A protein has these predicted regions:
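Conserved C-terminal RecA-like helicase domain
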Residues: 91-93, 101, 108-117, 252-327, ...
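Conserved two-lobed SF2 helicase motor
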Residues: 128-144, 299-313, 319-339
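Conserved interdomain hinge at the start of the Helicase C-terminal
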Residues: 224-250, 257-260, 314-323
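Non-catalytic terminal extensions of ATP-dependent helicases
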Residues: 302, 321-322, 405-814
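Conserved segment of the helicase C-terminal RecA-like domain
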Residues: 344-347, 351-354, 359-404
Length: 853
């Protein structure tokens, strides 16, 4: 058996992965695993858990259709342990990266760092480990590329109800159809009737499928429909001891609005607030939203949604797991397996916007959310509350005010639902409670990428694609359509000479690629090959070369929708002001306004190039370009992360911006060939790395620190603070660019004569609005204007003194201002606090001045 330091308390009970003998018998595996469960975890397993693990040890597939909180994770642990003991590589798949990441760290804790890896398309950690956590698409693409040769011994598919998702369901169905020698554990609390799934899996693998769907809910639920305002509902729950409460919203803005409202109503006790303050003592809330979150947390109110920085989201989860937060306001991401233990779920609505229209919640969606109520081991029951629509709450308030006075009751004017409003009532709630999750309707699609993955496997790819369609759980009409789509794709690939065939001796055909394909082309940035081709259109001698390369990279990235909406809103506001000044009539202003959108650099060039590329490279038809300017905008305006958030008023979406910058960094660093990089591009790549790491390094840091701390408050602090630096300056080039950008941004603001903005930036180091007003008055007495062109931004006008880097952890900097007369007698000077700057991602000064030499 292996040592616990490297392999965790459970991993140490299995043979090391590199040992020759890894074939422990099933009885011994059972004894070791359940001995660990009782002795180390201190848990008494339920009968359905023992049954499921015995079925897995017998070699059967298991469909675990049991309620939330019924211990599905323990069964998955048993499967991973059995795989380790028998020399098989096991996989855990989930629909979202956050859940994959959470499970990765959970498994590292019990199996050890050496035994667990993670692959999410943009993150690869220990990818050769015997236990792999990944998104469903990662496994599906591997199954298509490798088929039954894939080194996939067994798979735990979490949230298997996603197989019914119209866009992504194919990724849950494909492995079941293409990995006949793999053992599957399919898990969800809301699968509904699974007979068809079990029959299909048994038919495809010739292996028994055991369905476990009779496990009792460990914590029963009670339900309430209320006409009370939300604040009163939360207050009553707090008084009755029905905390912690998760208030479910269907938009991020609504979640924050409620959190800020509840923070002023006293939802926590003095003792709770003191405990929270102690737990977050070491946490650095460096961003605009971070400061909002800090205020909320100190009142006992948490917030949780996908627009937050990952480190803040995981901090809230950790505080909730410690039982420190009485109330969390969040979105319905709660229903996707995120580990936030709660007693009560309060739904602010029974409708949601699904991307096209408002509609009522489906039974599966409702049970996914409601099922999170009730903490096993703490609660005897969980509470699910649904709020009535706001107009009904107002009506109830008016009726209550009238009391039992018939005359007053007669005068009450009842409000009606707003026009077009999708409403709900007590009956809606009752039906959702009683309704079983809808029977899953599996989805399948055929794309160029899927076909090319099959061709990569070798052999008769066409036959395998036809079999994939025929074996799928689709209707005959759907299968016919899929076959037609496959015909189109294969014909296009033949016409463009991307694939060829070779006849075998037995008369069959082998398919092979006739072009070089990038590794993992369908997993990471699928348009990387287009980017490489498009770069040839640019002139490296052009002054705009670096910015245009950035624009080409950005066009291949997923849109950060909240950021682009903010850009569009600002552009339209500015255009409206100009049109009013020009005297345009209202109707004409409205017509022109519809044509204004966010910046799309190189749009015409890129569209023409991509049209040609799709003709030459057919698999590109699965994707599309989306020109935009976020990184370019930040570079051109010398913006840092905080300044950009402030400029577009997108503090609520800073997590979205960070993810986008992280994607841009990876694409620039991985995809653009070295011979296409100039010094400015290398500067931008280094700068992006510093920004991304300093704003949120939680994933890398938690991996590096996994298992290193048992102290809860220390662990919480580590999630919200940058990682320890091996040297005073970790990335010299990136940090230099960050500082130069910050100083030149001030030069740009001097050109615009913005003392208020400059004062807000520099008041902390003694240069507030009044100081800047005096400096600007003196400057413009001597010079007519400030230059902000490329020459003004050049390295010749920036001075850096590093002599106190090691002893004082500081740099002295000087940005010379390129004035209208070319005197260069004015400058911004300062001493940089290197530690604070690197930890916050924005420049922090020890001292600062605007000087006239």
């Amino acid at each position: 058996m292996a040592d616990t330091e490297h392999y965790g308390s459970l991993g140490a009970l299995a043979p090391a992965w590199d040992e020759g003998e890894r074939n422990i018998d099933t009885d011994e595996i059972y004894e070791r695993f359940f001995g660990w469960v009782t002795d180390v975890k201190g848990v008494e397993p339920w009968p359905h858990q023992e049954e499921a693990i015995m079925d897995l040890l017998a070699g059967d597939h298991v469909i675990l259709n049991t309620p939330t909180g019924s211990g599905k994770s323990l069964v998955a642990l048993g499967m991973h342990f059995a795989a380790l003991c028998t020399g098989r590589r096991s996989y855990y798949t989930a629909p979202i990266k956050a859940l994959v990441s959470e499970k990765f760290f959970d498994l590292v804790e019990v199996f050890g760092r050496d035994n667990v890896g993670m692959i999410t398309g943009d993150t690869h950690i220990n990818a050769d480990a015997p236990i792999i956590c990944c998104t469903a698409e990662i496994l599906a693409n591997q199954a298509l590329r490798e088929g039954r040769r894939a080194d996939v011994g067994c798979v735990a598919m979490d949230e298997f109800h996603y197989s019914g998702d119209s866009e992504r369901g194919w990724a849950w169905q494909v492995p079941l159809l293409t990995l006949p020698d793999t053992q599957f554990l399919l898990m969800s609390a809301t699968l509904g009737n699974v007979d068809a799934i079990a029959d299909k899996l048994e038919d495809m693998t010739d292996t028994d499928v055991d369905v476990i769907a009779d496990a009792p809910r460990p914590v029963p639920l009670t339900y309430e429909y209320t006409l009370d305002p939300l604040e009163k509902t939360v207050e009553l729950a707090f008084r009755k001891g029905e905390t912690p409460i998760y208030v479910v919203h269907f938009s991020q803005d609504a979640a924050l609005d409620t959190a800020q409202s509840l923070a002023s109503t006293g939802v926590s006790s003095k003792e709770q607030r003191q405990a929270i303050a102690e737990a977050i003592k070491g946490v650095k809330f460096t961003t605009a939203f971070g400061k909002i979150l800090q205020r909320l947390l100190r009142t006992g109110v948490g917030i949780h949604h996908a627009g937050m920085l990952p480190r803040y989201r995981r901090l809230v989860e950790q505080l909730a797991q410690q039982g420190l937060l009485p109330v969390i306001c969040g979105t319905d991401t709660l229903g996707v397996g995120i580990n936030v233990p709660i007693h009560s779920v309060v739904l602010t609505a029974l409708t949601k916007f699904d991307g096209t229209k408002m509609r009522r919640l489906r039974a599966r969606e409702f049970h996914q959310i409601a099922g999170r109520a009730g903490r096993m081991g703490f609660d005897t029951e969980g509470l699910v509350v649904a709020e009535a629509p706001e107009y009904e709450i107002e009506n109830a308030k008016a009726v209550a005010k009238a009391g039992n006075d018939p005359k007053k009751l007669k005068k009450v004017k009842r409000k009606k639902a707003p026009e077009g409003f999708v409403t709900w009532n007590q009956s809606t709630f009752d039906k959702l409670i009683d309704a079983a999750p809808e029977t899953l309707v599996p989805h399948m699609k055929i794309t160029h990428s899927m076909v090319l993955n099959e061709v990569t496997q070798g052999g008769d790819a066409r036959r395998r694609v036809d079999e994939l369609i025929d074996d799928s759980a689709q209707t005959p009409d759907q299968k016919e359509h899929l076959h037609e789509r496959a015909d189109e794709i294969f014909q296009t690939l033949f016409d463009t000479k991307v694939i060829e065939t070779e006849e075998r001796d037995d008369g069959g055909l082998d398919y092979f690629l006739d072009v070089d394909m990038p590794d993992d082309f369908a997993l990471d940035q699928p348009l990387s090959p287009f980017l490489l081709a498009a770069l040839e259109l640019l002139d490296p001698e052009s002054d705009m070369y670096a910015l245009d390369v950035i624009s080409m990279v950005e066009a291949t990235l997923e849109d950060p929708k909240q950021v682009l909406r903010a850009q569009e809103r600002q552009a339209r506001d500015a255009a409206m002001i100009r049109m009013k000044e020009d005297g345009l009539e209202y109707d004409e202003r409205m017509d022109r306004l519809q044509e204004i959108t966010y910046p799309k650099p190189l749009e015409d060039m890129l569209d023409a190039a991509f049209d040609q590329y799709r003709h030459d490279v057919p698999w590109a038809n699965d994707y599309w370009l989306s020109p935009k300017s976020v990184v370019r905008d930040m570079v051109e305006t010398a913006s840092d992360f905080t300044g950009y958030i402030s400029r577009y008023n997108i503090a609520r979406s800073e997590g979205t911006l960070l993810r986008y910058l992280s994607d841009a960094y990876r694409a620039l660093a991985r995809t653009v060939p070295d011979d296409k990089l100039d010094d400015q591009l290398r500067d931008v790549i280094s700068w992006l790395r510093v920004v991304v790491r300093s704003i949120d390094s939680s994933l890398v840091d938690e991996w590096e620190n996994a298992g290193a701390s048992d102290d809860a408050s220390q662990a919480a602090a580590s999630l919200a603070a940058p990682g320890a630096k091996a040297a005073v300056v970790e990335d010299r080039r990136g940090l230099t660019v960050l500082i130069r950008n910050a100083l030149f941004h001030r030069v740009q603001l001097m050109d615009l004569d913005k003392p208020e903005t400059l004062g807000a930036l520099d008041k902390e180091w003694g240069y507030g609005v009044h100081e800047w007003e005096d400096a600007l008055d003196d400057f413009y007495d001597e010079h007519e204007y400030v230059n902000t062109d490329a020459k003004a931004r050049s390295a010749e006008l920036f001075m850096l003194d590093e002599k106190h880097e090691n002893d004082e952890h500081s740099w002295h900097v000087r940005q010379i201002i390129d004035d209208s007369d070319g005197d260069h007698d004015w400058a911004i000077t300062g001493t940089i606090d290197l530690d604070a700057t690197q930890s916050s991602g924005e420049v922090v000064f020890f001292d600062y001045a605007v000087t006239n030499d």
